[in-house]
Structure formats: structure tokens, C-alpha cells
A protein has these predicted regions:
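Extreme N-terminal basic, low-complexity initiation segments
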Residues: 2-7
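Short, Lys/Arg-enriched N-terminal segments with co-localized hydrophobic residues
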Residues: 8-20
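Juxtamembrane/membrane-water interface recognition
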Residues: 9-12, 36, 297, 565
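N-terminal maturation segment of proteins
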Residues: 17-18, 40-607
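Bacterial N-terminal signal peptides that target proteins for export
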Residues: 20-28
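Bacterial N-terminal signal peptides
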Residues: 27-37
Length: 607
């Protein structure tokens, strides 16, 4: 996952009057360049830039926690409103911008601005549909558990301001927790909440308390005594509000959670179009996923055969093996890789060493420009656990010079030895290499660092998850095909297994929510079809219930990147080099691949 799920969740609040008089702090040099270059363009470009700047100025006030993550710190002391009035205000905000955009001559815009215009139009339509039709505010309690955790974590994780100032804003937000959680209880409709969402919320709700213990309380000594007393009082009030909310989650929400987590074809297809922003339909995605499923398994057998032959040199493999035989050989080769496990408490240290190894490899092979931005491997905060094993938390587009966090979830303490071993087999040292490539180098960390250098702040805010996740999967295959980790065939086999995971994600995503795939069928697809360990598959089953369409972004984005690379290689001919291609590809920010394709190949910008 590229961005922690809490970053942009929760309903939003109306714009305070004082904020209307101030402009958001843009990335100084790039923002100035972008504005001046637009003002030197056509009248349409000038009108568009005025609108885009105003949107970036006004939008953060609607979501104070999201604003902090973006790097706009005007609202660090405020906490989101989740009331019906706040939703109505947001709807008016969206419709106002839709009406203003209709008055701009899109055809008269520069190509770069045509892309940004399309992205904002898409985002506004998607947000309005989600609020008024999907209505997650009524049935998804995770929007709120992650909002409370993100409210404090986003203030404390990065040193964007003096600690005294950040602690003061933490106190401001903590004082508002009782109001927020009371609004949440009045907003959620238990009968509409799926049981799996309620169960996960019960586990996540208290996560913010660990943030107070680990990030806020140790810094109390930085404050004068009076401010210390205020912060302690705010923490006590927030903790009491969280405990009250925990009782409601356990005694009211959970017993009455009767919602259906399967969303059905209509909602799935609409959300798919918004989430992926790709020309591909659900049916086309399934067809390509099924084809890729068989192709990747076939390649896994070829690699596994070589590993098996090295282990058993006297064994003779059949020339035309059936699927059952292929399954046995692939599993036998995977067992060889599973012998190399990281220590239970050493996953973070393993990842730190692997980032250095991967960075040096990228430089040595001149694959892509390596930014000098700081990155730190951390234990995933408790409030964010339960959705994915790892994520890359890059600084917001308005925060410059801040660290990127590569967060890894620890092994749950309640797991028995069998469950721990299953997890470590899945995340063996070769899998950890692939995970680090995906999340950090040259995956999310590198790509998002490049993205942050693009001068359009609007494009930085409206990133495409499909482009981002697709690049990370592409990066996995790029590295192993270039010989990463000493050309070890075990690394190649594990990288193919991870690619197969992306494919099964896409197959399972729509099969569960549209076709009614059962847990047993999903586990069989993952464990037998995808060679995943039981713990990984069980966690993925939960994740597939908690979300829909997001699991399709990995494979769809990867295939779009592969298709684009082939097109550009043919168009550039002898001028093509991996370094030139990758640097150019990543120079446009993180828009959907179809827009990057148009920009790289000088094609019409999709509307």
C-alpha cells in the first residue's frame, strides 16, 4: 500500500472565515514556476490556474486531518466534522467547482493542464458519488478509527514544526475527541455495517492510545508546566471518550452489525471506473488476469524446475508435465526458499539492510535516478494495522524535506508458533526483499519522491493509486530481471509468486464482491492457485471484505505499465534505454497511466 488508509478518510468541515484570507503554503520555487508559466499561457490556462490555486487553498479546510498529511498546517488544531451538515457543505463545495470548471475551455488548455483538468473533474465526480450513493460514512466504522489515529499520528510522526507547537495542536484535537466520537455514534447505522468491519473497528479503536503512550507522553517535558497540564487533561478526556466509544462498538455496533460486505456488480463497476481511471472494464480485467495467472504459473514452473534439478540432480522431469506435477515441483522449490526466514523480531532490521542493498543495485545498474530524500523503516502504528502488512507513508506534497516512512506490521503477540511460522514462511528473506523493493526502492518511496518534484500541486494531491501500485509491482519485476540479489533463482521464484499474488488479488476482488466467491473458494485460489501461506491468505480474505476495487489496482497498474513500456520502446527505437524511459515516465507526477501514455507518445489527452 502506498499511502496509509487514514490519510484522507472521514467527513470534512466547513471552511472557517479566517482561512479564506490566507493562501496555502505551496512548494515555493516549483509552485511559483508553475503559476508563472501558466499565466504566460492562454486565457484558458490563466483561468484554470486561478481555479486550481483556489481549490488547493480551500479544499484542505474541509478535511483538517487530511490537510496535515498533505502538508498544509493551517488546520492542525482542528478535527474533522462528520455531521450531516458537514456532508452537505462538502457537496455544495464540489458542485460549485464542477460548475466553475464547466465554464473553462478545456480544448484551450495546455496539454499538462488538460491532464490536471481531467483529474480534478474525475475526483469531484468520484467524491460526490461516494458521499451520496456509496455512503461509507453510514456503514464503514474504519473511516473513523483511522481518522482518530491519523489525527494525532500525523502531528507527531514528522518534525515539520517545533515540538511545542505540534503538542499544542495535539491538545487542540484531543479536546475535540468527545465531540467527534459522539458524532460518529450518531452517524453510523449499525444495521448497515458489515460484521467484518465492526470486528476490525473493535480491534483498531484503541490504537490511538498507543500513539499517546509512545509519541505524545514522552514529549511532555518539552512544554511549560501549564501547557503540560492542559495536554494531560486533554489526553485524559480523549482516553475516556475512546473507552466510551469502545463500549459502544462492542455492545451496540458489533451485535447489530448486519450489513452485507459484498457490494454487487453495479456499485463495484462504478467504483472500479473511479478508482482505476482506466479504459479497461471489469470483464477485460478478468480476461487479462486469467491469462496472466496461467502465464506466471508457467514461468514459475520453469524457474522451479531449475531449482529442483539443482537439489535433486539425478531426478528426470517429464517433457510435458500435467498441472498436478507442476504444482508439486513449484511447491518443492518454494520450500527451498522458505528455509531462509527472518527472525520473529528482526523484520524491521532486515528491511533496513535490504533498502541499502536495493539502493546500491539501482545505482550500479543505472535503472532510474535515485533521489536523496530520507526514508525510515518503522513499526506500523497500532491504529493502522489489520489492513495490510506494510505501507509507504511519504510526506505530503506541501511538506518538503520530511521523511518517508516504510511501515511494517509486527507479528501479533497472540499468534501461536504455527501461525508465526506460517507468516515467516510467507515473508521469508526473499519475500522481504520483494516487499522492500515494492514499498521503498525503487518502488513507492522512489516513485513518490520523483512525483513530488512535479510542479503541479493539484496533480500531487490527486494521485492515481493504480499508477503508484502498478509501478511498485513493475519495479519488483524490473529488479529481478536485472539480476537483483545475485541472480538467485529463489529470488526470481519468489518475485513471480508476488506477481501471481497481484493477479489473484484482481481475480478475487471481483469474484468476491460480484460473483459471491466464498471464503473456502478464495482460500483455495490463494493457497493452491497462488502458493500463499495460510496466514497471508487468511489476512487477505479479511482485507478483501474490508475493501473493494483496491485489490485490482496492483495488476491493472502493472499491465498498463508493461503495455506502455512496450509502446515507448518501439516508438523510441535505438534511443530507448531503461534509465531514460524510467526517468521520463516518473517525471509527470502520479496521474493514471493513460495520461502518461498520451504525454510520452504525443497522443490526445483522454477526457
Amino acid at each position: 500500500a502506498s499511502v496509509p488508509q487514514w490519510a484522507y478518510t472521514g467527513q470534512k468541515r466547513a471552511i472557517p472565515e479566517e482561512s479564506k484570507m490566507r493562501k496555502v503554503r505551496l512548494v515555493p520555487i516549483l509552485a511559483l514556476f508553475f503559476s508563472l508559466s501558466a499565466l504566460a499561457g492562454s486565457p484558458a490556462d490563466q483561468a484554470w490556474q486561478t481555479l486550481a490555486d483556489r481549490f488547493i487553498d480551500e479544499m484542505p479546510a474541509l478535511n483538517p486531518v487530511g490537510a496535515t498529511h498533505l502538508g498544509d498546517h493551517r488546520f492542525d488544531g482542528q478535527l474533522n466534522e462528520v455531521s450531516a451538515e458537514a456532508r452537505a457543505e462538502e457537496a455544495r463545495f464540489i458542485r460549485r467547482y464542477q460548475a466553475e470548471m464547466a465554464g473553462i475551455d478545456r480544448a484551450g488548455l495546455s496539454r499538462a493542464n488538460q491532464v490536471d483538468y481531467a483529474l480534478l473533474a474525475h475526483e469531484l465526480e468520484s467524491s460526490l458519488w461516494s458521499m451520496e450513493q456509496l455512503q461509507p460514512w453510514a456503514w464503514n466504522p474504519l473511516e473513523y478509527t483511522q481518522l482518530t489515529g491519523g489525527a494525532i499520528y500525523s502531528l507527531m510522526a514528522r518534525e515539520f514544526a517545533p515540538i511545542e507547537q505540534r503538542l499544542g495542536h495535539a491538545a487542540d484535537r484531543l479536546e475535540q475527541f468527545p465531540r467527534l466520537l459522539e458524532q460518529v455514534r450518531g452517524t453510523l447505522v449499525p444495521a448497515r455495517v458489515p460484521q467484518v468491519h465492526a470486528e476490525t473497528a473493535v480491534r483498531q479503536n484503541k490504537g490511538v492510545l498507543s500513539i499517546l503512550d509512545n509519541m505524545v507522553k514522552p514529549a511532555l517535558g518539552s512544554l511549560p508546566e501549564a501547557e503540560q497540564e492542559r495536554l494531560v487533561t486533554a489526553m485524559e478526556a480523549a482516553s475516556a471518550a475512546i473507552e466510551t466509544h469502545q463500549e459502544w462498538l462492542e455492545n451496540t455496533l458489533l451485535p447489530n452489525a448486519k450489513g452485507e460486505f459484498r457490494v454487487g456488480p453495479d456499485i463495484f463497476d462504478t467504483r472500479l471506473a473511479f478508482a482505476l481511471n482506466t479504459p479497461l472494464t471489469r470483464e477485460q480485467i478478468r480476461e487479462r488476469a486469467e491469462s496472466e495467472f496461467h502465464r506466471v504459473r508457467g514461468e514459475m514452473y520453469e524457474v522451479a524446475s531449475a531449482i529442483y534439478a539443482e537439489q535433486y540432480p539425478l531426478a528426470k522431469l517429464p517433457e510435458a508435465p500435467d498441472e498436478a506435477f507442476r504444482q508439486v515441483i513449484i511447491r518443492a522449490a518454494l520450500e527451498v526458499a522458505y528455509k531462509d526466514l527472518p527472525p520473529r523480531d528482526g523484520i524491521v532490521e532486515t528491511a533496513k539492510a535490504q533498502i541499502e542493498q536495493a539502493t546500491q543495485f539501482v545505482r550500479d545498474h543505472d535503472l532510474v535516478e535515485v533521489p536523496d530524500d530520507p526514508v525510515e523503516v518503522i513499526i506500523m502504528p497500532e491504529f493502522a494495522r489489520g489492513f495490510s502488512i506494510a505501507y509507504c507513508d511519504s510526506p505530503g506534497p506541501l511538506d518538503t524535506g520530511q521523511k518517508t516512512f516504510y511501515a511494517i506490521s509486527p507479528i501479533p503477540e497472540q499468534w501461536d508458533d504455527k501461525q508465526v511460522n506460517s507468516f515467516l514462511r510467507e515473508y521469508n528473506v526473499y519475500s522481504m526483499q520483494d516487499l522492500t523493493v515494492h514499498e521503498a526502492m525503487p518502488g513507492h518511496f522512489l516513485q513518490l519522491a520523483h512525483s513530488g518534484r512535479y510542479p503541479s500541486t493539484l496533480r500531487a494531491v490527486l494521485q492515481s493509486g493504480t499508477f503508484i501500485e502498478g509501478w511498485a509491482v513493475y519495479a519488483e519485476q524490473l529488479m529481478v530481471n536485472a539480476g537483483y540479489n545475485d541472480n538467485d533463482p529463489r529470488q526470481k521464484l519468489i518475485a513471480l509468486k508476488w506477481l501471481l499474488r497481484s493477479v489473484t488479488n484482481a481475480l478475487m476482488d471481483q469474484a468476491i464482491h460480484v460473483d459471491g466467491m466464498s471464503r473456502e473458494e478464495a482460500m483455495d485460489l490463494m493457497v493452491e492457485g497462488g502458493f500463499q501461506e495460510e496466514r497471508e491468505a487468511a489476512l487477505k480474505w479479511v482485507r478483501a471484505q474490508l475493501s473493494f476495487t483496491q485489490l485490482s489496482t496492483y495488476m491493472v497498474g502493472y499491465l498498463e505499465h508493461i503495455d506502455l513500456q512496450a509502446e515507448v520502446r518501439e516508438a523510441w527505437g535505438e534511443d530507448y534505454t531503461p534509465r531514460r524511459y524510467h526517468d521520463t515516465l516518473l517525471s509527470f507526477g502520479s496521474p493514471p497511466v493513460q495520461y502518461v501514455r498520451a504525454l510520452m507518445l504525443d497522443l490526445p489527452i483522454p477526457e
